[in-house]
Amino acid sequence: MASRPVVITGLGVICAIGRDPTEFWLRLMSGQGGVTPVDDEAFAVFTARYAGQVPAGWIAEQLADADADLDRTAQLALIAARQAVGQAGLSADDVEADRFGLVLGKCQATPDAAGRYQPMHRTGDVVAGRLGMRGPRILVSTACAAGGNAVGLAKDKILTGEADVVLAGGVDPLLFGTYAGFAGLQALSTGPCAPYSRSDGLNLGEGAAFLLLEPLDRALARGATPLAEVAGYGLSADAYHATAPDPTGRGGASAVRRALADAGMSTDDVSYVSGHGTGTPANDAMEAKVMRAVFGDRAPRVPTSSIKSFVGHTLGAAGAVEAVASVLALQHGMAPPTIGFDTDSVTDLDFVPNVARRMPIETVVSNNYAFGGNNVALALTVPGGEREYEEFPDRPVVISGLGPVSGLGTGIAELAEAIAEGRQAVGRSPSLEGRTFAPRSLWRHMNHLSRMAIAASRLAWEDAGIKLPRAALDNVGLIFATAAGSVESTGGFDESVAVDPNKPAVLSFSNVVLNATGGAVCQTLGLRGPTTTICNGEASASIALDCAVEMIRAGKADVVLVVAADEATATAAAGTTITPYDRDRTGEAPGSAAVAILVESAEHCAERGGRAYARILGTGHAGTAEQDERESIRRSLAGLPAEGAGLVVGAGTGGRYDADEASVLLELVPDGLLTTSVGQTGDCQAASGAMNLAVAALAIRDGIAPALHGLERPYAGEVESYVRKPHLSEAVGQALVLTAAAGSVRGAVLLGAMA
């Protein structure tokens, strides 16, 4: 029996060919593209100056006065989000705020009104705040695959019961630095691009698109009109190269096959393919191989087109924009054309050249590929009627390997020793001198973040004692979690663009996308399973773990590697000490770390004779605002039986939210001793969340936990309510772990001892 049907009931889009779905579709059908010369004088330094731009007037006419101070990225996203909610006819009475989720795809860190980089999740926080959404909130950053990836993760949130309605989409503006990077790679066409024929380069674009997802039965009950069904989705990793796609098409083909398997369909069911179609020689040649590999002899009879020929490459928005086009194709029975197609090109495939085609369309596969080797495929179908379905499976999941890399040491043995001795390493960067965790030809060209993440991944794999044949690695998942990606690469690239935009540091550019480090891990370890990257600040690791559990429960993988890594943007003074939760020892200190956690089904771990640290009993996440932190902690814990936890590893950083957290936790978990890893490592952003998960698992198995040395005047409770000595006097049956991205997401994970 199939899983619960999830449908799309609302669409929103703003891009170079339309300020809403109606105008967007009319332009697609008329063959009227929106790629034009860039109207910003700053871009005159480039030889290739064509892009898909959104007129400023289109933005201004759809915004309220209260939105005028928002940055351009947030404005684009808010316009498309409101359109999708409006078309779905969704009101505040139709969904509880706590059950209304958001999954947003972005490729680039975007500037605020003052030109400073914002946290990646900031755009999603703005959209959620303006629309009153307090449910699960995820920022996915798998570069140019992010928009499609977001739709798949949104479906998961509905199937697991975490949300009743989820808004999924993508957004990215046209940025000078990104343009310089693609120009430096010589990937831009000097005129409007011609995917699948001339293939002489791509055009960049900008825009936003959203799709509103909800269960079919719920949509019909409230009188909504289903526009399409999200029948399935597939993710994969190329494990091949930082920027170039695997020329064999293996990764892209794997994503399509996984999407169809998820949907319970065969290749014969596919009517039309919405291709990635960037117009670069490498991409277009690879996609042709994907078509032939997936569809075999039928490939020439499966119409495939690229709407990037209309709008340019909208990066993180591309998958969502193309998903909107796919839904409209299903509705109208029309395949959008590939415009600019040179009909003299020799090809056996049907790329719907230049003119839209009326045809029966029951199922669309929408494909996207990205730097870092991320691939995603969506299987969208004409919605069916209500039918019986199976509940989301409940497979037990365990943590079986830990790989910490921080100033405290490298590997679980060194971390355990540092905790037992009470050592502090605030501000101390991990040292990997003299150690190589990848082939030297790769290792010497890697930035520090990738080296840390790869080292952590290898160590977790070794700690788990897992040995799999090469073929099995195709089904091992990888979820990378980071707040900011590589500071080293971003800084180096920005500096090079400032000196000469025509000579950017292209090696740094390939590592500016936040999923690049996850791609490097996949390439080094040979992992080609379902892969994604989560960028929700300090809450990223718990969200990544949540996604890993969902993959395993759904049967999409038996083993998933969760890797979190961040490096400090500033350096803490030598000898800096902080004591979280103490009134007199406040102050935040940055740190750098990477932590890998190997997660697998309990059955798989037992069959191979593995020794797990802990069971994952449950997770919870709640969207929040800075003025709502206490209530958000309560909401993140609402579905977890955490009151009996013997240990609580909090998100405390020594900052202004420690008092709120301590007060609520001591109230809700009165018998749990409170601690955090941050006092010993500094605030390592996403890696601190993963470190907290690691020390909780270590406490359950080995009975040690970070002691809060120097704690004398806690914000809440008595000192006896906190961990004061690393060797715990009682065995820990359950441990609660908190993560927090202030003003964005609060997360909670409950771990339990192995039976």
Residue ranges: model-predicted function:
Residues 1-67, 88, 106, 217-229, ...:
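ACP-dependent fatty acid/polyketide chain-elongation machinery
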Residues 37, 152, 156, 160, ...:
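Glycine-/small-residue-rich "gating" segment that lines the acyl/pantetheine channel
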Residues 5-9, 32-37, 192-263, 272, ...:
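Condensing-enzyme catalytic core mediating Claisen C-C bond formation in acyl metabolism
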Residues 77-89, 123-124, 131, 138-170, ...:
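Active-site-proximal alpha-helical scaffold in enzymes
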Residues 1-8, 92-97, 265-269, 295-300, ...:
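Flexible, low-complexity linker/loop segments at domain and module junctions
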Residues 8-10, 28, 81, 102, ...:
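Conserved small-residue
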Residues 162-184, 189-200, 233-247, 272-285, ...:
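Acyl-CoA/ACP chain-elongation machinery
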Residues 1-4, 36-79, 106-153, 162, ...:
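Conserved catalytic cysteine-centered active-site region
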